[in-house]
Protein backbone atom coordinates (compact mmCIF):
# COMPACT_ATOMS: atom_id res chain seq x y z
CA UNK A 1 0.00 0.00 0.00
CA UNK A 2 1.07 3.60 -0.54
CA UNK A 3 0.71 7.00 1.10
CA UNK A 4 0.97 8.85 -2.22
CA UNK A 5 0.25 8.00 -5.85
CA UNK A 6 1.38 10.45 -8.55
CA UNK A 7 0.50 9.78 -12.18
CA UNK A 8 -0.12 11.43 -15.52
CA UNK A 9 -2.31 9.01 -17.44
CA UNK A 10 -2.71 9.04 -21.21
CA UNK A 11 -5.24 11.37 -22.80
CA UNK A 12 -8.17 10.03 -24.78
CA UNK A 13 -7.76 10.37 -28.59
CA UNK A 14 -4.02 10.72 -28.12
CA UNK A 15 -1.23 8.34 -29.01
CA UNK A 16 -1.24 4.58 -28.55
CA UNK A 17 1.08 4.68 -25.52
CA UNK A 18 2.39 1.12 -25.84
CA UNK A 19 3.62 1.96 -29.34
CA UNK A 20 5.06 5.29 -28.24
CA UNK A 21 7.05 3.67 -25.41
CA UNK A 22 7.97 0.38 -27.08
CA UNK A 23 11.73 1.06 -27.18
CA UNK A 24 12.03 1.93 -23.49
CA UNK A 25 9.81 -0.96 -22.34
CA UNK A 26 11.79 -3.47 -24.41
CA UNK A 27 15.17 -1.98 -23.47
CA UNK A 28 14.37 -1.87 -19.76
CA UNK A 29 13.11 -5.46 -19.91
CA UNK A 30 9.52 -4.82 -18.81
CA UNK A 31 8.24 -7.02 -21.65
CA UNK A 32 9.76 -9.21 -24.36
CA UNK A 33 7.08 -8.23 -26.86
CA UNK A 34 5.61 -4.72 -26.63
CA UNK A 35 2.38 -5.99 -28.24
CA UNK A 36 1.68 -7.72 -24.92
CA UNK A 37 1.93 -4.33 -23.22
CA UNK A 38 -0.76 -2.98 -25.55
CA UNK A 39 -3.33 -5.28 -23.96
CA UNK A 40 -2.94 -3.68 -20.55
CA UNK A 41 -2.55 -0.05 -21.59
CA UNK A 42 -5.25 2.45 -20.64
CA UNK A 43 -7.63 3.00 -23.53
CA UNK A 44 -5.70 0.78 -25.94
CA UNK A 45 -7.58 -0.08 -29.10
CA UNK A 46 -5.63 -3.34 -29.31
CA UNK A 47 -7.53 -5.29 -26.70
CA UNK A 48 -11.06 -6.48 -26.99
CA UNK A 49 -13.81 -4.55 -25.34
CA UNK A 50 -17.54 -4.61 -25.79
CA UNK A 51 -18.83 -1.16 -26.70
CA UNK A 52 -22.33 -1.74 -25.28
CA UNK A 53 -20.84 -3.08 -22.05
CA UNK A 54 -18.58 -0.02 -21.83
CA UNK A 55 -21.57 2.29 -22.31
CA UNK A 56 -23.32 0.60 -19.37
CA UNK A 57 -20.27 1.17 -17.14
CA UNK A 58 -19.66 4.79 -18.09
CA UNK A 59 -20.21 7.64 -15.69
CA UNK A 60 -22.68 10.33 -16.83
CA UNK A 61 -19.89 12.67 -17.98
CA UNK A 62 -18.12 9.87 -19.86
CA UNK A 63 -21.36 8.81 -21.52
CA UNK A 64 -22.10 12.38 -22.62
CA UNK A 65 -18.65 12.77 -24.21
CA UNK A 66 -18.81 9.36 -25.93
CA UNK A 67 -22.30 10.13 -27.28
CA UNK A 68 -21.02 13.40 -28.78
CA UNK A 69 -18.02 11.64 -30.32
CA UNK A 70 -20.23 8.91 -31.78
CA UNK A 71 -21.98 11.52 -33.93
CA UNK A 72 -18.70 12.48 -35.65
CA UNK A 73 -16.54 9.32 -35.49
CA UNK A 74 -17.88 5.95 -34.33
CA UNK A 75 -14.45 4.33 -33.98
CA UNK A 76 -13.13 7.20 -31.82
CA UNK A 77 -16.28 6.97 -29.70
CA UNK A 78 -15.64 3.27 -29.12
CA UNK A 79 -12.01 3.95 -28.22
CA UNK A 80 -13.09 6.77 -25.88
CA UNK A 81 -15.62 4.51 -24.16
CA UNK A 82 -12.83 2.02 -23.42
CA UNK A 83 -10.54 4.80 -22.23
CA UNK A 84 -13.12 6.27 -19.83
CA UNK A 85 -14.02 2.86 -18.40
CA UNK A 86 -10.30 2.15 -17.93
CA UNK A 87 -9.83 5.49 -16.15
CA UNK A 88 -12.76 4.73 -13.85
CA UNK A 89 -11.00 1.45 -12.99
CA UNK A 90 -7.71 3.31 -12.44
CA UNK A 91 -9.27 5.66 -9.87
CA UNK A 92 -10.88 2.73 -8.04
CA UNK A 93 -7.59 0.81 -8.01
CA UNK A 94 -5.66 3.88 -6.83
CA UNK A 95 -8.14 4.28 -3.98
CA UNK A 96 -7.72 0.61 -2.99
CA UNK A 97 -3.91 0.87 -3.05
CA UNK A 98 -3.75 3.94 -0.80
CA UNK A 99 -3.30 3.79 2.94
CA UNK A 100 -5.89 5.67 4.97
CA UNK A 101 -5.15 9.41 4.85
CA UNK A 102 -3.16 8.86 1.64
CA UNK A 103 -3.32 11.08 -1.43
CA UNK A 104 -3.60 10.44 -5.13
CA UNK A 105 -2.45 13.09 -7.59
CA UNK A 106 -3.40 12.95 -11.27
CA UNK A 107 -2.14 15.29 -13.99
CA UNK A 108 -4.45 15.42 -17.01
CA UNK A 109 -5.58 17.79 -19.73
CA UNK A 110 -8.66 18.31 -21.81
CA UNK A 111 -8.72 18.08 -25.57
CA UNK A 112 -10.97 18.36 -28.55
CA UNK A 113 -11.59 16.04 -31.49
CA UNK A 114 -13.47 17.19 -34.58
CA UNK A 115 -14.98 20.05 -32.55
CA UNK A 116 -16.13 17.73 -29.73
CA UNK A 117 -14.79 19.00 -26.42
CA UNK A 118 -13.39 16.16 -24.35
CA UNK A 119 -13.31 17.13 -20.69
CA UNK A 120 -10.93 14.50 -19.31
CA UNK A 121 -10.49 16.46 -16.09
CA UNK A 122 -14.22 16.58 -15.35
CA UNK A 123 -14.54 12.84 -16.03
CA UNK A 124 -11.56 12.14 -13.78
CA UNK A 125 -13.01 14.25 -10.96
CA UNK A 126 -16.33 12.41 -11.24
CA UNK A 127 -14.48 9.06 -11.25
CA UNK A 128 -12.41 9.99 -8.20
CA UNK A 129 -15.50 10.97 -6.21
CA UNK A 130 -17.20 7.76 -7.29
CA UNK A 131 -14.16 5.72 -6.17
CA UNK A 132 -14.34 7.28 -2.69
CA UNK A 133 -11.85 10.14 -2.81
CA UNK A 134 -12.79 13.27 -0.87
CA UNK A 135 -11.57 16.85 -0.48
CA UNK A 136 -10.52 17.03 -4.12
CA UNK A 137 -8.26 19.94 -4.95
CA UNK A 138 -8.15 21.00 -8.60
CA UNK A 139 -5.25 23.12 -9.83
CA UNK A 140 -5.34 24.48 -13.37
CA UNK A 141 -1.91 24.97 -14.93
CA UNK A 142 -1.01 26.63 -18.24
CA UNK A 143 1.42 24.62 -20.37
CA UNK A 144 4.00 26.96 -21.82
CA UNK A 145 6.51 24.56 -23.36
CA UNK A 146 5.39 21.18 -24.59
CA UNK A 147 7.86 18.91 -26.34
CA UNK A 148 5.26 16.97 -28.32
CA UNK A 149 3.24 18.97 -30.82
CA UNK A 150 0.26 20.74 -29.25
CA UNK A 151 -1.52 21.37 -32.58
CA UNK A 152 -4.13 19.47 -34.61
CA UNK A 153 -5.16 20.01 -38.22
CA UNK A 154 -8.73 20.18 -39.56
CA UNK A 155 -8.91 16.35 -39.69
CA UNK A 156 -7.93 16.04 -36.02
CA UNK A 157 -4.39 14.80 -36.75
CA UNK A 158 -1.37 16.08 -34.84
CA UNK A 159 0.68 18.67 -36.75
CA UNK A 160 3.53 21.10 -36.09
CA UNK A 161 1.76 23.84 -38.08
CA UNK A 162 1.29 26.72 -35.63
CA UNK A 163 -1.63 28.06 -37.69
CA UNK A 164 -3.62 24.97 -36.74
CA UNK A 165 -5.85 24.62 -33.70
CA UNK A 166 -3.95 24.35 -30.42
CA UNK A 167 -4.76 21.54 -28.02
CA UNK A 168 -3.24 20.70 -24.64
CA UNK A 169 -2.62 24.35 -23.75
CA UNK A 170 -3.41 23.69 -20.10
CA UNK A 171 -3.55 20.79 -17.73
CA UNK A 172 -5.14 20.03 -14.40
CA UNK A 173 -3.57 18.65 -11.26
CA UNK A 174 -6.27 16.81 -9.35
CA UNK A 175 -5.53 15.71 -5.80
CA UNK A 176 -7.81 13.48 -3.77
CA UNK A 177 -7.59 12.10 -0.25
CA UNK A 178 -8.58 8.71 1.11
CA UNK A 179 -9.95 9.03 4.61
CA UNK A 180 -9.99 6.32 7.25
CA UNK A 181 -12.85 3.86 6.94
Language-model segment annotations:
Residues 1-106, 110-181:
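Class I S-adenosyl-L-methionine-dependent methyltransferase catalytic core
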Amino acid sequence: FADLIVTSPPYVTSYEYADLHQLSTLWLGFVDDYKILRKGTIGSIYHESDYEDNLNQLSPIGLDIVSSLYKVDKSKAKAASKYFVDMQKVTSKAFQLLNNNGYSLFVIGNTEYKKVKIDNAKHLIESMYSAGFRDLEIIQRKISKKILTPYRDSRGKFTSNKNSRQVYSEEFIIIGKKYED
